[in-house]
């Protein structure tokens, strides 16, 4: 990590929502490694989570707070006492086909967090975890965009489709998820512009996340699909190709940059390493685990993902801030996943 002035100094406490989640646990781990303290939100007691981080980083550096409702003002107010930065990774009420639940709920939660944080002078940075699906990379049929995606492009199609009666039922959960991120991200940036709080807000937009799972109790949708392939289960994602992948630890690095780097302000960070196909994934898994005869064949894929222009800037941030060569490769990402999951 680069030395110099950071928005949140080492030793400060960062709040990470959904700390027992796949991405949030990776972010928590990196923050602890860099000398920060973490207060993680969970929906119920997770003694294994406290034990995992305390065993590796000592007592007093990680704690959990139970928040069952992200719109609970009183609980949030208490949770933000002494907090210098927030990584809002959890997605409240995400997986529903009803947009009244799946879209409006998470948006209200984000605005609630911003409003409460504005009353705490200690908060200097907030980072929202979004998705590359908040940009217009693919349509409802999985076809890639025909024009390059830039940092001011939004997936307005998803917002429209979320409320349309003609949207196929099997697509609604994913569409609603993208729509919630579009609406939440856009309204958060507008809220900051309108209210001029004492903190900045940045947004990290991960692609299909692949990499190490820290603990057996941690799961993530993307890694469930990879583990399923190792067990001989064809993934439903064969029918829907995510346009880009990203290593989980690179996602964590970009969250840290968004929290700490003064020059990164009110930015959407496109966390996308490279396009991929399921044929590539299957081929690499077979190389990594040659004795595994269960891994199914992947279908032919002739689609060419869209060009995500801002991904280059995200990679440069990792190079400059962490001194790395760039994004982690798909092979290395899968290797770490197989090592921990096989």
UniProtKB/Swiss-Prot annotation:
Gene3D superfamilies: NAD(P)-binding Rossmann-like Domain. Disruption phenotype: Completely abolishes the production of novofumigatonin, but accumulates asnovolin A. Its EC number is 1.-.-.-. Pfam families: Epimerase (PF01370). Pathway: Secondary metabolite biosynthesis; terpenoid biosynthesis. It is an enzyme of class 1 (oxidoreductase). This is Ketoreductase nvfG. The gene is nvfG.
């Amino acid at each position: 990590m680069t030395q110099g002035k950071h928005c949140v100094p080492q030793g400060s406490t960062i709040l990470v929502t959904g700390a027992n989640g796949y991405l949030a646990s990776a972010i928590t781990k990196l923050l602890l490694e860099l000398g920060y303290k973490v207060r993680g939100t969970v929906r119920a007691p997770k003694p294994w989570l406290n034990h995992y981080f305390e065993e590796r980083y000592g007592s007093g550096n990680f704690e959990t707070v139970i928040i069952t409702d992200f719109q609970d003002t009183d609980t949030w107010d208490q949770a933000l006492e002494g907090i210098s930065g927030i990584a809002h990774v959890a997605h409240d009420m995400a997986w529903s086909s009803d947009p009244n639940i799946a879209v409006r709920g998470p948006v209200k939660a984000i605005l609630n967090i911003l409003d409460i944080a504005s009353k705490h002078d200690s908060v200097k940075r907030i980072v929202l975890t979004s998705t590359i699906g908040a940009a217009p990379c693919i349509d409802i049929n999985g076809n890639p965009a025909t024009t390059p995606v830039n940092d001011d492009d939004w997936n307005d199609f998803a917002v429209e489709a979320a409320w349309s009666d003609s949207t196929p039922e099997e697509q609604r959960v994913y569409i609603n998820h993208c729509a919630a991120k579009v609406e939440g991200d856009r309204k958060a940036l507008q809220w900051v512009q309108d209210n001029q709080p004492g903190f900045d807000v940045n947004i990290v937009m991960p692609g299909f996340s692949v990499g190490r799972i820290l603990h057996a109790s941690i799961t993530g949708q993307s890694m469930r699909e990879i583990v399923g392939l190792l067990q001989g289960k064809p993934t439903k994602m064969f029918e829907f190709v995510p346009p880009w992948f990203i290593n989980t630890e690179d996602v964590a690095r970009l969250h840290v940059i968004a929290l700490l780097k003064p020059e990164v302000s009110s930015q959407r960070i496109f966390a996308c390493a490279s396009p991929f196909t399921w044929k590539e994934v299957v081929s690499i898994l077979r190389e990594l685990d040659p004795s595994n005869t269960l891994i199914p064949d992947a279908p032919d894929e002739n689609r060419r993902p869209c060009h995500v222009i801002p991904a280059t800037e995200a990679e440069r941030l990792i190079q400059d801030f962490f001194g790395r060569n760039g994004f982690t490769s798909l092979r290395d990402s899968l290797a770490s996943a197989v090592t921990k999951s096989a």
